């Protein structure tokens, strides 16, 4: 698509799917002319040498990346299926997390997750979404832990 549209820039990060959040490494794709103009605007200090070394190693191990992404997708599929069974409203998307509406039980459940070493985020600070929890997706075995706690709590 980037060669088809002269004004399209696709930006990606290695942070989530590759497990490199601390490296702050990303990349972009654009047609040659646009990429050159963007290259001229780059900051003085781009990526550090450690980030370069880590990304090079990760890219060499493409099978690991694909396996990890497939495991995450299986975990997501499992979690969404279980949330439907529990009749919990959720916001799905293409990110590595979902938001689950827990109503007034949100605060209590946050504490229970914390006690069980499952770290989650409070959710959306937007009117109408205050009772949503943000849960990061992971492999199915991790999502089973989340579902077990949800089921136990909602009994």
Predicted segment positions?
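Short, conserved loop/helix-junction motifs that constitute active-site signature segments
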Residues: 1-5
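PLP-dependent aminotransferase class I/II
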Residues: 7-84, 88-91
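Short acidic/glycine-enriched loop/turn segments that link adjacent beta-strands
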Residues: 22, 94, 127-131
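Short hydrophobic/aromatic beta-strand micro-patches
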Residues: 29, 99-103, 136-138
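Hydrophobic side chains in well-ordered alpha-helices
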Residues: 38, 109, 146-149
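Conserved PLP-binding catalytic core of the aspartate aminotransferase-like
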Residues: 72-73, 77, 82-116
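PLP-dependent enzyme catalytic core of the Aspartate aminotransferase-like
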Residues: 115-116, 125-155
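Active-site catalytic microenvironments in core metabolic enzymes, especially phosphate/sugar-handling
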Residues: 121
């Amino acid at each position: 698509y980037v060669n088809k549209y002269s004004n399209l820039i696709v930006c990606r990060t290695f942070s989530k799917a590759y497990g490199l959040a601390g490296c702050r490494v990303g990349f972009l794709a654009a047609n040659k002319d646009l990429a050159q103009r963007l290259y001229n605007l780059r900051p003085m200090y781009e990526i550090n040498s450690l980030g370069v070394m880590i990304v090079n190693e990760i890219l060499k191990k493409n099978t690991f990346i694909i396996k990890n992404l497939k495991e995450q997708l299986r975990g997501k599929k499992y979690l969404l299926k279980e949330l439907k069974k529990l009749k919990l409203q959720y916001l799905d998307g293409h990110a590595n997390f979902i938001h689950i509406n827990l109503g007034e039980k949100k605060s209590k459940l946050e504490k229970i997750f914390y006690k069980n070493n499952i770290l989650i985020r409070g959710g959306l600070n937007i009117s109408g979404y205050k009772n949503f929890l943000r849960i990061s997706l992971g492999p199915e075995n991790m999502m089973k832990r989340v579902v077990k706690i949800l089921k136990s709590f909602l009994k």
